[in-house]
Every structure is written in C-alpha cells, then in structure tokens.
Amino acid sequence: MQTQSTCYKGTQKMAIKGVLWHSTGANNPNIKRYVQPSEIRPKEDSYTRDKWLQVLGKNKYNNDWNHIEHKAGVNAWVGKLADGSIASVQTMPWDFSPWGCGSGKNGSCNDGWIQIEICEDSLKDKNYFSKIYKEACELTAYICKTFNIEPKGFVVHNGVRVPTIICHQDSYQLGFGSNHKDTYHWFSSYGKDMTDVRNDVAKIIKETDIKKLYRVRKSVNNAKSQIGAFTSLANAKTACKKAGNDYKVFDWNCTVVYSNKK
C-alpha cells in the first residue's frame, strides 16, 4: 500500500460501481517506476520493506508515486516485477476513491470506479501486451467477483448510464474524465477494445466458477485479504507460506486445507 502518497492520505471511501483501466503513456513496463513500499508498514502487510523491494525492484530515482508531491493515485498497477514476471500490485484499498481519471461535465469516475494502471512498454511487443492484458483481465475478474460487479453491465452515475468496466478515454467520452486516449491508443494495435475486455472478464468469471480453486486468504469471509486462487494445492501452499502466519488455504468448500500456524 502506498500509504505515504497524497492520494492515500487525502482521499475518502467510495461505493464501488465498477473498474476503470488506465495505461501509463510512458515506455517503462516496470512497476518499480511507479510503486515503492512505504517506510512504515501497514499491520496487515506481512512483507517487510526490504522484501517488497526485492519483489518490486528499487526505484533509484525516487520518482515513484508514493510521495506527497505526487497528486494522483490508483488502486492497483499491472506490469513487470524485478524478476521480469508480470503481476498486479494493489496500492490502495479497493474502496478508497482514486485520483486517476480527472473529471468532466457530468462529474468524475473517481467516485465509484476502482482504477488500475497498466505499465506501457514501447507498444510494439505483442508478447508483453498479451501477458499484461491477461493479468489485467484476471485482476478485474477477481474484483468483479469480490464486489458483485456484472462485467457486461451498466450503472447509472449522476443520471448517465455507464458501463461497469471502462477505460480513461471512455470516462472522457461519457463526461466523467479528462481527455486521455488510454487504453485505445495501445489496445487497438492488437485488435482489442473495452468490449473485448468486458467479454474476456466475463469469460474468466464463468470459467473460475466452474473450476475447483484453492484460495489463499486470512479467513474464509475476508475476500479482501485474498492473494491468489490456484488450481494446484502445491502452488497455493507455496503462496501461503510466503504470505505470512495469518494466511490459510481454503478449498472450494470453504474448508481449511493448509495453515501456516501449527
């Protein structure tokens, strides 16, 4: 969690209506450029600062978003970790209102939409795009399941009918955001738009509803603490061991099948 940021300190809670995607607009796919751990660790975070720096990589320029000087903030990021793998990192609680899309004539989607920022590369690497697209869809599917969001649905926001899953450019077109092109300027090169995102997220939800998954979280009812859902018990145990003593592995019947506590 980027607890040192102005957004984290100054925002307020929101009623969650949907998910909004951004992309960074800069050629740097590394999450460490934007995300660094706080000096003071939240109690619920089992990772130390040094451990997070090992995972993320250190931003030697100190120009990440976890500072009071930066006047923006989102709920999660998707990009490369220090080892080159693709992952999602949550930086604010899901119900914290982000400062991400600005505002328009009808208001702002900062009020109601969990916002994800995807780290851009040169926009020419199809393999990277495929991986981050998949990761962002899976994260969005998780959010939709957690908060009962219909991925292909709509909500009425300030009198306007708005899709539950949108991007920054969508928010502008609907009168709820500033005029940024993301994510269409990138996605269109690979034949994707937000309709595809909604369909792919819905497909993931349908598939995971069918699959028998092992979920790693603190308690069966604490969905916000979940760090992953796995088809393999061995992989779930590995993730649980890394997460800390408070975490357990639950099967599809909500039964504890592994716990770090002896």
Question: Each PLM stretch: what is its role?
Answer:
Residues 1-152, 156:
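Active-site-adjacent loop/helix surface patches within enzyme catalytic domains
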Residues 9-13, 122-210:
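Basic/polar, cationic surfaces and motifs that engage anionic cell-wall
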Residues 23-28, 81-82, 217-221, 250-255:
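Short, flexible beta-strand-to-coil junctions
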Residues 91, 225-227, 257-258:
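Local beta-strand/beta-hairpin segments that build beta-sheet-rich folds
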Residues 156-164, 225-231, 250-251:
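Short acidic, glycine/serine/threonine-rich helix-capping segments at coil-helix boundaries
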Residues 210-225, 248:
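Short aromatic-glycine-(Arg/Gly/Cys) micro-motifs in beta-strand/loop hairpins
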Residues 231-247:
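A short, charged, amphipathic alpha-helix used as a generic interaction element across diverse proteins
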Residues 245-262:
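Short, mixed-charge low-complexity intrinsically disordered segments
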